[in-house]
Amino acid sequence: MTSRIAWNSILPALLAITTISVAASTTPPKPEDTGAAAQYRQLNATADPGAAPAGTYKLDPHHTSVIAKLAHMDLSRYTLRFDDVSGSFDFNPSGASASNVEINIDPKSVDTGDRAFDKRIASKFFEAEKYPTINFTADSVKIMNGHASVAGILNFHGVKKTVVLHTTYRGFAQSRMGFSGEATFKRSDFGVSEWVPLEADDVTILVETEFTRL
């Protein structure tokens, strides 16, 4: 009888210890404060334009997209992408007038997902054989509170006009500077009136890009 009473006293304690041990072994460990998480914080620490060093930056085509959108019969926004984009950015954080940007686009690289239609757009819409480059240049870039209005000259279809690119500064990290940009203009101002009004006259350009410091 004495041994039975002792066992009844010990058994609940053993069960409690076993339960705690199992729970502890199945609890996932907390991730260490290293690797991607630490690197991410380091990247975000340089969101101030003043922290980016002056110099010449080259557009990274692998981290750049230029997309054009225009309404089709007011039913949807038809989307064009350009696959061949190059450019450079001379940056001076202490003087906006000393900063400038240039972007070049090959109109033959237009991509709608339909190669036959791409060729038609390049020839009839852009007249790419006659005008082989779409060029945007600006000699004054001023970033304030993460945003900038970059007024530059768009050379498109043989016509040069001022276009404002509204940009958001994404930050500087590991020799890279990132921007998002948007501009809207009338293509008829540049002599491109093919398919108006079936295809809208207003064109919106969306740019996502990174520049790498040389």
Specify the residue positions occupied by each region the protein language model found:
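Bacterial N-terminal signal peptides
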Residues: I10-S21
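Bacterial N-terminal signal peptides that target proteins for export
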Residues: T2-L11
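Low-complexity, acidic/polar, glycine-enriched regions of mature
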Residues: A23-L214
